[in-house]
Amino acid sequence: MLSCLAPSSSRFGQEDTIIQQSMPSTSPFAMQFPSLASTLLHHNQSPKHSNPGSSGIQDAHPNQPGAAADAFLVKCTQCHKRFPEYQSLSEHIASEHPHDKLNCGAAQPESDAEDEQSNMSGSSRRYAKSPLASNNNSSTANANNNSTSSQSMNNNSELAKNHNSANKMSPMCSPGSLTPGDLFAQLQHPPPQLPPHLHAQFMAAAASLAMQSARTASSPSQQQQQQLQQQQQLQQQQQHQMAMQQLLPPQLPGSNSSVGSNSAYDLDLSAPRSTSSPGSTTGDLSGAYPCMQCTASFASREQLEQHEQLHSPCGPAAVSNVSQTCRICHKAFANVYRLQRHMISHDESALLRKFKCKECDKAFKFKHHLKEHVRIHSGEKPFGCDNCGKRFSHSGSFSSHMTSKKCISMGLKLNNNRALLKRLEKSPGSASSASRRSPSDHGKGKLPEQPSLPGLPHPMSYFASDAQVQGGSAAPAPFPPFHPNYMNAALLAFPHNFMAAAAGLDPRVHPYSIQRLLQLSAAGQQQREEEREEQQKQQQHDEEETPDEPKLVMDIEEPETKEMAPTPEATEAATPIKREESREASPDPESYRSSSQAIKQEQEPLNVAEERQTPVEEHAPVEHAADLRCSRCSKQFNHPTELVQHEKVLCGLIKEELEQHFQQQQATSFALASASEEDEEDEEMDVEEEPRQESGERKVRVRTAINEEQQQQLKQHYSLNARPSRDEFRMIAARLQLDPRVVQVWFQNNRSRERKMQSFQNNQAAGAAPPMPIDSQASLTREDQPLDLSVKRDPLTPKSESSPPYIAPPSGEALNPEAINLSRKFSTSASMSPASISPSSAAALYFGAAPPPSPPNSQLDSTPRSGQAFPGLPPYMLPMSLPMEALFKMRPGGDFASNHALMNSIKLPDYRGTSLSPGGSEKRSWRDDDSRISHEDEFGAGVLMPPKPRRGKAETHGHAGDPDLPYVCDQCDKAFAKQSSLARHKYEHSGQRPYQCIECPKAFKHKHHLTEHKRLHSGEKPFQCSKCLKRFSHSGSYSQHMNHRYSYCKPYRE
């Protein structure tokens, strides 16, 4: 509220009349306007503000020269600042105290020094800014000010009047304070009679005393509340000012406002100013610094600069709600860490991200990341789920789908039952093989499988809608086709299918199937893993094998050949029997690992015998396999790529040789009497050396896989000495890391082959049988033959790389040649393949045509005991004590092979294991080449020496300059301990990629890389972590997981 009204200078000399006539003399009025009379009477006492006519007032009051010095100054009740006139006070209240007009709190007193300082500063500013104000127009200004004051505070004045009329007290006083009338009533003597202007001052002093007494009487809690109210009002005022600054239109720097001033009453008062209520936004409080990008303006430059950061793309993080922004591409990020990761693409893209995409501007650190990114543009999705059919372009997405239970089948771990499902699909009638279990398996938490009854339909018949035909009984109506894996999973979960059929329930929709499926996946997981391993071993033995495999199946105890009849009738009758006996005598090697698996040995032969009852039908080609047959030689292949390679490279050579030498091929009968006698002697010696523990024990065959490197070493030993002693057998076995018995049997089998070759050549020279037609010979090339890797072979015969043509029966028995040699594993021929010719056999092949120089005292032994080996070639000789250096000169590209085109075309290190058939997977590991010691220099003198200490894997290759690494690469500084390692290393420099993927255009240098790559297309993951059950398609990924992540990978939980 206003404490006084400013007088008008034009009313000079009439103040008493105005006071007495127009203003009431009650005490409330005197309290509201305490200094009204003094300011009206002594307004012009100051000499610098007085008119010439003011001397009359001074003469009229000569006794009060100093009383009027401060009487005409108006003081604000809120901040106690003094102003010379009402206009300045009203402007001050409107600008500085817009919210305090209704404040009933008492004002704090101010010291005299502060009063004088504020008085001088206020008067100087006022008269410096408004010099046009004079006494001549003071009446007009007074009228304008009064009207302005009444208009600006009409709401507050009305509320104050109502409050005063209701409570009969001053609005500046607290409700519990004393009024001046009450204060006068407490006095013993009435106040003296004073002149009007002194009486007004006296009343003002009494009012101030009343306020002080009320302030002292008020409680501390009320003071705290008043302070809190003042703080809230100050905060509201600041918020209001900020809102006004943002909403006000911009002003140019030359506007009518004081530059650099923060106070509203310091502005030019000549400009129009709104005096509306505090909630109004129409007041002109705009600053001198407007924003050029929006309509906001600010009073200081600092505020403007802080505001302009909101519009800047590179604003700092100190500004609220401003994200991190890249200074180069102006991309915004949520936090500084993402910005730092993004800046790598700008700062280090030239060094780290070398692989750039041609379709977009992205770059990658690794090439395989770029390859996976390119699939996004091309739409290629090489990874497919076998269970739901969904395909993926990234291997990570595919792995996440298969392992995170996004696919219901994988989430239920149906992948473990895949081998069993395939067997159900292939053999619908034989469920005995699927239900093979040992008695020890039961009782370990494993669920036994129930074979399906013969009268019930096959589970897969639901998809063909022929359940009634196969089952022979009424069945429910066929349902829509389900995915086979889903269907089989449900059938496996329901162990008793006959119960569902008898009850008229379909296992696909029975709710018990899913529950049973969950139990099966949890309880039978280990059982499925063991079964799958067993089936894989069994399939490897059952499937047809190509001669390209670096594996030789050895027989510990060969069946006596006396039992074989030489006549075709006996051969035909003995075929299934011998095959069953051989299968009975050959359980898996894993059956010897534990006692529980050993019990399976009694059950397995019977089941295998049932599967082998029709061997001819089993080897019959599949219907779709007719397309994978060679058009020239009618040879059957397992893979389209192998067929194309055969027709382009190999088959033409074979056809030319067949046309030139088909008259030399004759089908003769077998005369194995002498060879059988010698075999008996060898076996009797073996039996004497190792007597059998039980006379009633049947013969047991142990299959031993010998890789190609071991075969080469064995052939080298055999070429030096075909009949080594027992100690020499042990030395050879120790060097090759084989069992001595295996090495001994290998030598024995090679001697047996040589004797059979000798008998066959004798009968061929005598002309015992008429020549065989070319058709029967062509049919012979696609049948099973025993492996032969050590004897001399005729390069002109189509079967020379695997075995000599001695097992061709005279009468149409070429379809079943297994009765000739039933004691070893058969393999499918793949025609003349350079990959199957070893260096020693290739050297022996051409040794007779170009005999090398030999030592003068060296004793050469003729391998054939009688007759010629081949009619078209001179007799060949195998050296007994020839140094290994001489043998290596006969390798492809050597001195003795320079005149032979076929031998020069052989590149053994480049084409080992080139078969692409599923059955011809390479079993040799590159680790064997790196870790195995070279034996070339050990047999220089033809004597078996004590074994050398083996070199570690890390020592088999290094850099040039190492005396232990004599083989240095001429294209880099690497050195190797073996010539074979250097040859394989040079293959890396050649840039050749002969192994082509048929699914995509990728090609690889090594076959094992192609084998692992194919798993990406098939989805096969043969490697699994035993802890978290995560599966891997690559052995490298599996090794990395087991070596680095196995310690902290999370265990799998159902």
UniProtKB/Swiss-Prot annotation:
Put simply, this protein is called Zinc finger protein 1
Q: Which domain of life is it from?
A: Eukaryota
| Tissues in which the UniProt entry reports expression | Mesoderm and mesodermally-derived structures in the embryo including the dorsal vessel, support cells of the gonads, and segment-specific arrays of adult muscle precursor. Also identified in motor neurons of developing CNS.
This protein's record includes keyword Ribosomal protein: no
* Cross-referenced SMART domains: HOX, ZnF_C2H2
One cellular component (GO) term of this entry:
nucleus
A single MF term (Gene Ontology): zinc ion binding
What PROSITE patterns does the entry give?
A: HOMEOBOX_1 (PS00027), HOMEOBOX_2 (PS50071), ZINC_FINGER_C2H2_1 (PS00028), ZINC_FINGER_C2H2_2 (PS50157)
Zinc finger regions (C2H2-type), where? Answer: 74-97, 289-311, 324-346, 355-377, 383-407, 628-651, 967-989, 995-1017, 1023-1044
Composition bias (Polar residues) maps to 42-57, 158-168, 253-264, 707-719, 857-866
Q: Acidic residues bias located where? A: 676-689
Recite the UniProt keywords alphabetically.
Answer: DNA-binding, Homeobox, Metal-binding, Nucleus, Phosphoprotein, Repeat, Zinc, Zinc-finger
Question: Which regions are flagged for Low complexity bias?
Answer: 133-157, 222-249, 274-283, 427-437, 564-576
What the entry lists under InterPro entries is as follows: HD, Homeobox_CS, Homeodomain-like_sf, Znf_C2H2_sf, Znf_C2H2_type, ZnF_E-box_Homeobox
Write the lineage as a comma-separated list: Eukaryota, Metazoa, Ecdysozoa, Arthropoda, Hexapoda
Cellular localization per UniProt = Nucleus
Its job:
Involved in the development of the embryonic central nervous system, embryonic mesoderm and adult musculature.
Q: Name one GO biological process term.
A: axonal fasciculation
Family, similarity comment:
Belongs to the delta-EF1/ZFH-1 C2H2-type zinc-finger family.
Chief localization: nucleus
UniProt lists the gene as zfh1
List the biased-composition ranges (Basic and acidic residues).
Answer: 438-447, 527-541, 548-563, 577-586, 609-623, 690-699, 781-796, 921-938
DNA-binding region location: 699-758
Q: Which Gene3D superfamilies match?
A: Classic Zinc Finger, Homeodomain-like
Segments of this protein annotated with the region Disordered:
42-65, 99-197, 211-283, 424-463, 521-623, 663-722, 755-815, 848-871, 910-958
Q: Which residues carry this modification: Phosphoserine?
A: 582, 586, 934
